[in-house]
């Protein structure tokens, strides 16, 4: 009996930690990535402007069920924004480059702030390995690229690779099948 008491005491003592670790996943709710949610996410990635009625037809649920699922996916952070995908070359930003940056640890916040402030920085990743940061940059000219690189060079050692062409970009995310 003492062991059973310890088991339940420890479970309920750490239950808030378990809940925090798994976010909004509840032990009693449906799987957050069931077949309908995967279909819904796929449809929204193909066209985020679809109405709830169009989504309902595509996913095979009612409009209220779709609205509720979208609300839950937004609240849980699965859907965190709706964004247009821009053809950068058509608006005068034909050059895509990748910047690798190696810098001391104390420069982390300064680099993150700079990356957030520069409109030419499309993505910034803190990475493992020899480099500390990997950034995707979109610019109108090599002169603009050079100015961006110089801003980061003040924080550490840089290396730049220019993309000749982009073969795969903005590929839809496919949620894993977690149903048993």
What are these regions, as identified by a protein language model?
Residues 2-180:
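A compositional/biophysical signature of low hydrophobicity enriched in polar/charged and small residues
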